[in-house]
Amino acid sequence: NHYAGSPEMGMEFRPYYISRELAKKGHNVTIIAGSFSHLRKTNPAISENFTEQEIDGVKYVWIKTDEYDSNDIARALSMYHFCRALTANKKKIVERYKPDVVISSSTYPLDSYPAYRIAKLAGAKYIHEVHDMWPLTLYEAGGMSRKNPFVIAMQFAEDHAYKKSDVVVSLLPHAKDYMTEHGMKPDHFRYIPNGVVINEWDTTREVPSEHREAF
């Protein structure tokens, strides 16, 4: 997941929490992420690709990616460089981490290409996780043209992910029909929403008086 974070760094949190719980159950979990994400409060300072860091029992592997300020060409280049680094180092990844399951879960579906190749090389299962419908979101909510080259590239990548996955995991319970139309086998769909770690929400604070008065 290009944008994977942690409680200290900031979003995205889902990869961290799922990986942490899997690690508690005895699984050896590795997250490969980009060194820069617009979603994080802080980003790791690294000087080279494949810098490793352990956070709460989960191994993070950082790929050096470009910084960007907005949804422009710089962000697209960051996506490209992340996926290119994964593809170029797929043999190294397989030999070092020996995966039996590979999950692609970045917001954008381009990571399905290197993830599938890594899984195939390792003889591993390939899972694609969807939490934002790209490119559907880009033209339905973002106003981009379906003929935009970026949208077209994302559509090819999304279709590839659905066709090649052994399982497609989604936070969206009603996405199955759409995914099936784009190549997913119906029985490959799994709906897994975000969970809640109850003991991390035990601390309660008194509601400020101005809020109580307003409501």
Residue ranges and their predicted role:
Residues 1-15, 33:
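Nucleotide-activated donor-dependent transferases that construct or modify glycoconjugates
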Residues 2, 6, 67-76, 96-97, ...:
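Acceptor-binding helix/loop patch of EC 2.4 sugar-transfer enzymes
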Residues 7, 76-91, 99-124, 128-137:
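An aromatic- and histidine-rich active-site surface loop
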Residues 18-27:
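A short, Lys/Arg-enriched amphipathic alpha-helix followed by its capping loop at the start of a domain
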Residues 31-94:
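A conserved catalytic-core segment of Leloir-type glycosyltransferases
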Residues 35, 174, 192-195:
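Carbohydrate-associated surface elements
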Residues 45-50, 202-215:
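A short helix/loop element that forms part of the nucleotide-sugar donor recognition site in Leloir-type
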Residues 91, 110-113, 117-122, 148-168:
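Membrane-proximal helix-turn-helix segments that form the acceptor-binding/catalytic region
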